[in-house]
């Protein structure tokens, strides 16, 4: 759970887990008592309605069946006159933990526990989890350890070139349900990825679902994602997702506070990479805006995590990768972000090739197989040209995005569960292509 207060309103977020301790159920309805004037800001894994002080959540088509011993979860962010009191909820008409299965079966069953559904409010871990024991070094961080930058190349603890290949989330606060262990484990074990990028929007046009609109809730969600990656022994990119405002220096003080918090929390974890400004735009120049901003933020991180890799965005939505060539940052273990969308940016490849040839450390922290809007048609031929070049050069990359939003760049079809173990039918054309590429290259 998380909570915050803004504009005289209380707010928070919950993830509720229903575990079936009895016979299989094929549908469920949960009811939660809520305070007055409760409004849902976002919700996932259920069909939600509010009447008076009761919020009703019914199953989606994909998560109605809960087998014995299995669990499902749903969640929501809200604003209200008061905070929601934590506690048990009702499931299928009965208080969770008593007899919330099929009532006729319950009445005829001598074992009162046979149809119990227990619902609990799930809280994130209070402390950072320990990295898993892996004496054979079979998972990414145990095998490759603290990464660094040498001669323009990302290298592992042994000084050997190492390429990160993975997925970026969409905005964490819009799709919080995808921040879960099963999803990330599927990316690691089935998609053959070694990194997850956590995109935390800073100030997305004033809708409140971003860091500036909900600092504590956004930070808690991001930390949940980082903790999961540490548990899974994966690398993770903490992305200060500057899209609005275009000039990252607008929120320099907030960025300092944020990176002080997260770099202190994760100081001893080689898993964590920091991306300090996603896509500067709107006239923000390298020497006039971005570099001076970076020179204020990098020392904050270095104080706590002196050896961490830091990615710095470049002008025009991280397309002008050449700008740092003549005016680089004077810090070790710094890389420069380049972003492309295959159906739009084919003309940028020669510039990238020139920068790499001159030894600029390039990290493709975001790319899409479609056009720059996130929509339109996929251009897999152009995507293959880009990724083949990156693989040859050992340049790391993350695909946008791991979510089920109804747009071309999503890897999951609308309505697909966030809980991993996805089948081929769950994937969009982009998802099928990306999974195949990551598994076979």
Residue ranges of each PLM-predicted region?
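Extracellular glycoside hydrolase catalytic/binding regions
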Residues: 145-148, 171, 176, 252-273, ...
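A mature extracytoplasmic/lumenal domain signature
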Residues: 34, 61, 78, 168, ...
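N-terminal carbohydrate-binding accessory modules
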Residues: 122-195, 212, 432, 436
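Residues at or immediately flanking beta-strands
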Residues: 29, 195, 235-237, 271-273, ...
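Acidic/histidine-rich helix-loop elements
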Residues: 162-183, 202-216, 372-375, 419-424
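Extracellular low-complexity, O-glycosylation-prone Ser/Thr/Pro/Gly-rich "stalks"
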Residues: 1-136, 411-441
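Aromatic-lined substrate-binding rim segments of carbohydrate-active enzymes
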Residues: 180-244, 252-257, 298-304, 379-394
């Amino acid at each position: 759970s998380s909570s915050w207060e803004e504009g005289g309103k209380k707010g928070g977020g919950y993830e509720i887990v229903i575990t079936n301790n009895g016979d299989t159920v094929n549908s469920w309805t949960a009811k939660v008592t809520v305070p007055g004037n409760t409004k849902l800001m976002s919700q996932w894994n259920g069909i939600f309605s509010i009447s008076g002080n009761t919020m009703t959540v019914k199953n989606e088509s994909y998560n109605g069946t809960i087998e014995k011993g299995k669990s499902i979860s749903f969640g929501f962010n809200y604003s209200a006159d008061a905070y929601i009191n934590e506690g048990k909820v009702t499931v299928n008409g009965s208080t969770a933990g008593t007899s919330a299965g099929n009532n006729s079966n319950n009445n005829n069953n001598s074992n009162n526990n046979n149809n119990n559904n227990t619902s609990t409010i799930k809280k994130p871990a209070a402390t950072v989890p320990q990295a898993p024991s892996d004496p054979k070094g079979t998972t990414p961080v145990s095998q490759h350890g603290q990464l660094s930058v040498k001669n323009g190349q990302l290298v592992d603890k042994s000084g050997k070139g190492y390429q990160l290949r993975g997925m970026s989330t969409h905005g964490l606060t819009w799709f919080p349900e995808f921040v879960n262990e099963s999803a990330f484990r599927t990316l690691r074990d089935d998609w053959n990825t070694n990194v997850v990028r956590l995109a935390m929007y800073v100030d997305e046009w004033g809708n409140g679902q971003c860091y500036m609109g909900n600092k504590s809730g956004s930070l808690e969600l991001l930390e949940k994602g980082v903790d999961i990656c540490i548990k899974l022994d994966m690398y993770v990119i903490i992305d200060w997702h500057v899209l609005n405002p275009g000039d990252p220096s607008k929120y320099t003080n907030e960025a300092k506070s944020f990176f002080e918090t997260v770099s202190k929390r994760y100081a001893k974890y080689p898993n964590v990479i920091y991306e300090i400004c996603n896509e500067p735009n709107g006239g923000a120049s390298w020497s006039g805006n971005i570099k001076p901003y970076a020179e204020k933020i990098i020392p904050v991180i270095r104080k706590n995590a002196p050896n961490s890799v830091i990615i710095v965005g470049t002008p025009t939505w991280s397309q002008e990768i050449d700008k740092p060539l003549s005016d680089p940052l004077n810090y070790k273990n710094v890389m420069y972000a380049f972003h492309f969308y295959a159906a739009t940016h084919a003309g940028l490849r020669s510039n990238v090739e020139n920068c790499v040839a001159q030894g600029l450390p390039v990290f493709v922290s975001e790319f899409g197989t479609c056009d720059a809007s996130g929509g339109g048609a996929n251009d897999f031929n152009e995507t293959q040209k880009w990724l083949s070049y990156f693989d040859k050069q050992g340049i790391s990359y993350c695909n946008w995005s791991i979510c089920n939003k109804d747009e071309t760049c999503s890897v999951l079809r609308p309505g697909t569960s966030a809980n991993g173990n996805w089948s081929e039918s769950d994937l969009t054309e982009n998802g099928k292509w990306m999974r195949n590429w990551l598994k076979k290259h």
